[in-house]
Amino acid sequence: MLRLITQSGDIVQELRRLHHRPVPSPWPVMAQVVAAMEHWAAMDQDAPPRVSGAELDAAYQRISQEKLSVIRQACAALEQVYRPQLPKTQVSFPEDGTVRGQRFYPVRRAGFYLEAKRGDALGNLLRQGMLAKTVGVAERVLVTETISSTILVAAQEMGIEEIYLAAGVPAIAMLTWGAKNIAPVESITGAGCPRVMAAKQLVSGVVTIDQTLARTNLMVLADGEANGQWLALDLLAHAEQYPNASAVLLTDRLELGEEVIQSVNRYCREQEHSVHTEKALAHYGLVAIVEDLEACGSWINEFCPHILLLAMEDPWTMVEKVQRAREIYIGHRSPSILGHYLSGANRLQTQDGAMATASELAFHCFLRSSQLLDYGNNPPPPWLKDLVNWQGLTAIEERLGQLGRLKES
């Protein structure tokens, strides 16, 4: 049962309880992961089964033209989002005659881990594949335990044809160090079970990985103009995807809060598969009635939700007060699912029953950068020579001194 709280002190106490819950540590499974890695290294490391060209071709025959069209539209939409956000090489020419800049270039080979259980498996693949494609990664590898025609077609639409049937820790090990006839990758992205996420953390010094999200909490601010059924579905959708994350609604209208709770209860009664969602909202869901929505900005910044929905007539005044939310969805008609495809919010999520894991993509997963500096004929600044002298760095001091003598000559 979704709880309703009206007392300010109780609201703060409950928000703190939800916010300060211990984050599951990867260390309890790390010993198992290390053992699995060592076992894999001791084996011959034969390549796992690879999806054949015939299977790839046949996948197109098994899906409808309508589904193919939707996949292509999703790919095009994601590229339109990603391309303007691509970091660009920057070069500046200060008046002192130096040249300074930063250059970006893609990794050569990237690996995508896809766990096709419950959750948005197709969306996870599209977000990984299109970001890497837009960046310009030449070689893209997909590993997954189970495949469907839809997944195979989506992969090919993004130029991914190297697909292996592999899962778990061995799949992460294979991507990291390679196997017979399989080259290692430079980056690994994708959400998986806790063992997979721990394995990615373990190899993060060898390859680049996406950022593991400890908990993807949701907070909704809604005024009296908000639609109660929409808000109920926002909370339900979040609990369905992230059953171990909190879903909190703050509103200044008691009637709206009661309507949301009634809608949630009705949905859970009507949907047979909603048992995990119902339990998630009972443990981590909350509807709180506040006196003033405008004063909630300090709560948002204290409890820093990953996702913030502003279902308000004038949401932009609240946006200016928010400093610690990763994703902000503005207005009554901006549910967070739109962010996956229309704003570049790149959460990757997999869920199995009451357990969910998530990670966050970013351009750095597929990009390398180099700092550029042409110092010209300028002598080093005196403070730099003093700085290295104080630390006894004699070789550096001598090298800087040579630059000064060249300028004098």
Curated annotation (Swiss-Prot):
<dbReference type="InterPro" id="IPR012131">
    <property type="entry name" value="Hstdl_DH"/>
</dbReference>
<dbReference type="GO" id="GO:0005829">
    <property type="term" value="C:cytosol"/>
</dbReference>
<dbReference type="GO" id="GO:0005737">
    <property type="term" value="C:cytoplasm"/>
</dbReference>
<dbReference type="GO" id="GO:0046872">
    <property type="term" value="F:metal ion binding"/>
</dbReference>
<dbReference type="InterPro" id="IPR016161">
    <property type="entry name" value="Ald_DH/histidinol_DH"/>
</dbReference>
<dbReference type="Pfam" id="PF00815">
    <property type="entry name" value="Histidinol_dh"/>
</dbReference>
<comment type="similarity">
    <text>Belongs to the histidinol dehydrogenase family.</text>
</comment>
<protein>
    <recommendedName>
        <fullName>Histidinol dehydrogenase homolog</fullName>
        <ecNumber>1.1.-.-</ecNumber>
    </recommendedName>
</protein>
<dbReference type="InterPro" id="IPR022695">
    <property type="entry name" value="Histidinol_DH_monofunct"/>
</dbReference>
<dbReference type="GO" id="GO:0051287">
    <property type="term" value="F:NAD binding"/>
</dbReference>
<keyword id="KW-0560">Oxidoreductase</keyword>
<dbReference type="GO" id="GO:0000105">
    <property type="term" value="P:L-histidine biosynthetic process"/>
</dbReference>
<dbReference type="GO" id="GO:0004399">
    <property type="term" value="F:histidinol dehydrogenase activity"/>
</dbReference>
